[in-house]
Amino acid sequence: FRLRPEFVDKFTQTDIDGGDDGDKRCKFFTNGQSKDISSMTTETAGYLSEKWSNQKDDKTTASNTADAGVETDFPLFRLADVYLMYAECVVRTVKDKKEWDDWAGGSDAESDSRKQGAIYWINKVRERSKASDVWASNFADDDAFLQFILDERARELYHEGYRRTDL
């Protein structure tokens, strides 16, 4: 699959280059490829996704015969999806509650505590992929936090059939 440049931009150059410091979810084939897709008929236009490859754990190619089929496993429901859904629900709920509290003269303490819980689960997802932790101070407001969660869903769940629903 070719990846749109807008999606590639959700990762840093360190992630794309690989190595120990990069986000391990960034599985792009970039050798000889340009990031931009200038033409659909040019094979080298656009990075390619290696997320779903027909390789065994030892990196040898698995069978792909008419009788055996492809040996690529794929998840039906992932725990990372649950964690990110929870975080999104918290932020949306906190945002609505803050608007109510502002109108009614309430407190932000409970909302801040719930957001810390959401950040904990986001960081559990990021920990698995060796991405750095995020903190509440990374986000100017709830809208920025919500956008980060949607971008994190894109980074974590790409090519799993969720993105269209997320949009």
Predicted features and spans:
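Polar, glycine-rich mid-to-C-terminal structural blocks
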Residues: 1-9
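Acidic/polar-rich alpha-helix caps and helix-coil junctions
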Residues: 18-167
